Amino acid sequence: YVKELEAYCAELEKNHDEDHGEKLLFFTLDSYDNKTCIYNTTDIMLDHMMISAPATQILAGLGDGDQAGRMTDTVDAMDEMMELFYQHKGLTDKFAEGTDTSVIQKNRIPSRHLNIRYMKMFSGAFMYAGGNHIGIEWDSVKDLILTQKPSIDENGRLTGGAYFGWGIAHEIGHQINQGEYAITEVTNNYFAVLAQADGTNDSVRFSYDDVYEKVTSGATGYPSNVFTQLGMYWQLHLAYDPGFAQKTYATYQEAFDNLLFARVDTYARNPETFNSAGPEVELTLTGNQDQNLMRLVSAAAKKDLTTFFTRWGYVPDEETKSFMSQFEEETRALYYIDDNSRTAVLENKASDLAGQEVLAGVDVQTEHSDVTLKMT
């Protein structure tokens, strides 16, 4: 492919002049413009994504040296990232032998490819999602070529390299968002965090200090910052998924069993998947994303998450309260979890102070509504 690409790009201007250039005597009036000439195009078809971009920009992104290696790493990483995203939706093309046909039909990755496509942008934009494609500007095309393939360890933790940046994953998220609970510019970013989180607080786009302020404020409604709101969805992943962010699984059933949002989205697509088990209160969905989310997550976790969602400013209606109350109450303070603490647990580095005499003394000072604790 790289050899053909190099040869093709070398002939672009000549081919344009021969086929598209308007001639007057010895002059070509319609001169070649590499940003607009329709010949300057290459299509790269992958398992779940098609990249349609200027050939010269793909070649420029490959740089010098091991161009074929960089191309291979790039297409492999795109396939891996899409598989990761789809597994968190409970979608895959990998099913255990003997899986019921109806399960396969309802939970298979869509056959239609997503398309990352070079587009002329409207004012101020460099990337967007629309229809069944992601539009990117000229300068963003080169960034599709990875300089270092992501390295993922056996626990699903990103240890080196990177995927394709926040913007691409953000726009893909717009395309694959689950409509029953989607919040624009929030839930689509769950996929962007999946692509970059490495088990540390610094690797996510939001601030855990802002999360703490929200969940201790007692205020109803969403936080004003969409990235802070994203923290709620991420805390649910941290609380209920046993692996790190990039962990994928061999079959649909394994992904369903291990990924909270795989169950959430499966139940959203087909509530009967939950209801067929004969729950005390069946899952029904409404036109309200907040009520849907609370019901879906509680169903997926098999926990009454009233306290968690209330801390985040959600107000369950009577039907949602009834649905969540059939489950055992979640007693863990999930609204305080962060990446660092969860990584410490996964790596068996967390400290348990239960039963230990660790405080020699506590000094309490109060001034109006401020309380200062000094522990020794």
What are these regions (language model features)?
Residues 1-10, 14, 374-376:
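Beta-strand-enriched, solvent-exposed domains that form extended recognition/catalytic surfaces
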Residues 22-253, 257-261, 265:
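Catalytic cores of extracellular degradative/oxidative enzymes
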Residues 62-67, 247-250, 276-287, 320, ...:
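Short, flexible/disordered intra-domain loops and linkers
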Residues 71-75, 79, 257, 279-280, ...:
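Long, domain-scale functional regions
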Residues 192, 258-278, 313:
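Acidic helix/loop microenvironments that form the catalytic cleft of cell-wall polysaccharide enzymes
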Residues 217-224, 279-285, 294-296:
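Active-site rim elements
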Residues 285-375:
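Beta/coil-rich, acidic/histidine-enriched accessory regions frequently appended to metallopeptidases
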